[in-house]
Design a protein with these regions (language model features):
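Acidic, metal-coordinating catalytic segment for phosphate/diphosphate chemistry
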Residues: 83, 87-170
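Active-site nucleotide-donor binding segment shared across nucleotidyl transfer reactions
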Residues: 42-83
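Generic alpha-helical secondary structure
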Residues: 33-41, 82-86, 140
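Flexible glycine-/small-residue-rich
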Residues: 20-22, 77-79, 120-122
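Helical scaffold of the NTase/Pol beta-like nucleotidyltransferase catalytic core
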Residues: 1-58
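Divalent metal-coordination and catalytic microenvironments
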Residues: 11, 61, 147
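Short flexible coil/turn linkers enriched for glycine and charged/polar residues
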Residues: 12, 51, 67-70, 112, ...
Length: 170
């Protein structure tokens, strides 16, 4: 910090903002072990599953794929009232920062320092969404290619033949 002081008119406030930015960048680049992430996701799911608006709740992303380390925790929920579900998610205990809160998505940072993302989908989309948000990106691309060759379209909303939905439930 002291090296920057006075250099090109950089003052204390600017230095403080630069340090905050570097800290945030380092935090966002950190990955945590699955051994640390699993108890966290288990605790969050235990807390949220008592919400009567939630029909199903599962971990997704790299945690569900059992990767050795995860960059964030992804949770998928099925329920009809997305806004209310997201509101209960961002207000749960242990949240230190709300990063986003919308009708179908919420993102928070929790006291363990990890980012947790929640996505709410309809019950009839849950299976397709769980597959899609579990990934990996490469797997999803490969799956879409196989589906295309069979005259199907696969997305987070379901499996379609033309405009007709032919799958998506879990």
């Amino acid at each position: 910090g002291d090296t920057l002081k006075g250099l090109f008119g950089i003052g204390d406030k600017k230095i403080e903002n630069i340090v905050k930015g570097i800290t945030l960048f380092k935090t966002s680049q950190q990955r945590i072990s699955i051994g640390m992430a699993y108890p966290v996701v288990k605790r969050i799911i235990e807390e949220l599953k008592h919400n009567p608006k939630i029909q199903d709740i599962q971990a997704a992303g790299s945690l569900r794929r059992m990767k050795e380390t995860v960059g964030d925790i992804d949770i998928l929920v099925s329920g009809a009232e997305g806004t209310e579900i997201v509101k209960s998610f961002v207000n749960m205990r242990g949240v230190t920062q709300i990063l986003a809160a919308g009708d179908t998505k919420g993102s928070v940072r929790i006291e363990e320092g990890v980012q947790v993302d929640l996505r709410v989908v309809r019950e009839d989309e849950f299976g397709a969404a769980l597959q899609y948000f579990t990934g990996s990106k490469e797997h999803n691309v490969h799956l879409r290619e196989i589906a295309r060759k069979k005259g199907l379209k696969v997305s987070e909303y379901g499996i379609f033949r033309g405009d007709k939905k032919v799958g998506g439930r879990l």
